[in-house]
Amino acid sequence: MMAKKPPKPAPRRIFQERLKITALPLYFEGFLLIKRSGYREYEHYWTELRGTTLFFYTDKKSIIYVDKLDIVDLTCLTEQNSTEKNCAKFTLVLPKEEVQLKTENTESGEEWRGFILTVTELSVPQNVSLLPGQVIKLHEVLEREKKRRIETEQSTSVEKEKEPTEDYVDVLNPMPACFYTVSRKEATEMLQKNPSLGNMILRPGSDSRNYSITIRQEIDIPRIKHYKVMSVGQNYTIELEKPVTLPNLFSVIDYFVKETRGNLRPFICSTDENTGQEPSMEGRSEKLKKNPHIA
């Protein structure tokens, strides 16, 4: 019986976009069945091992991952006896949870086990049944991971020594001035009623983690558009035909301004005269109602 062919890697464009989002080297990839704490059943994901993190995608072509698992603090990897034919099952024991993995065949199970142990223990395991070429690849990954960790430590040390001048902006202004805790409908109404204040609003997304940009364009007739801004690790990705990943929300706003050559302007209410601070949402709404043309 012929062995199953290894899964084909994702197309180059997808690979490059994922690399920009994760900022980690790809060591191994393939389909995995995952059962995390709280899962009732196994869920099927295209999985990438990048550095010491597993990234889970709904399918092979998805650019943005739906979940990730940091395995750098892996306590142990335990194999499970599977009643299913030609299937490998094992558990990743982590400090805060245990994650069950299942592969479509025993061959890929050995590969996953080998790569996971190599990057977490920083040594090639001796008790894996792999071909010579696969073992060579494990040694290559080991050297890459050692080098990556050294470079990461050096980079972290250099950053700590630098004066954090750029961080002062974030401390004083944790969110861009055009951020409002409003719904999609409320953002639309604010832009329509007060065009002199700007034509772009940053607001919370449909969940508590991500964001959305609402804009009002006047090309032929006024049009309202909405863009999703996904929080991905420490970065933010604007969901466009070609996704754009930026380091913070201030950069997201700047991107829209620059790409439209200033046609898009952040929607900004005036500050309270007495305190010099942004008014509350109720205060903003009340001021807008009383004077729709505040500067």
Swiss-Prot record:
Record Gene3D superfamilies: Pleckstrin-homology domain (PH domain)/Phosphotyrosine-binding domain (PTB), SH2 domain
Domain SH2 span(s) in chain numbering: 177-280
Pfam families, per the entry: PH, SH2
GO cellular component: cytoplasm; cytosol; mitochondrion; nuclear body; nucleus; protein-containing complex
Localization, UniProt: Nucleus; Cytoplasm; Mitochondrion
Keywords, sorted A to Z: Cytoplasm, Mitochondrion, Nucleus, Phosphoprotein, SH2 domain
InterPro entries for the chain: PH-like_dom_sf (IPR011993), PH_domain (IPR001849), SH2 (IPR000980), SH2_dom_sf (IPR036860), STAP1/STAP2 (IPR039111), STAP1_SH2 (IPR035877)
Family matches, as PROSITE patterns: PH_DOMAIN, SH2
Post-translational note: Phosphorylated on tyrosine by TEC. Phosphorylated on tyrosine by KIT.
Assembly behavior: Interacts with KIT and CSF1R. Interacts with URI1; the interaction is phosphorylation-dependent and occurs in a growth-dependent manner.
Name the record gives this protein: Signal-transducing adaptor protein 1
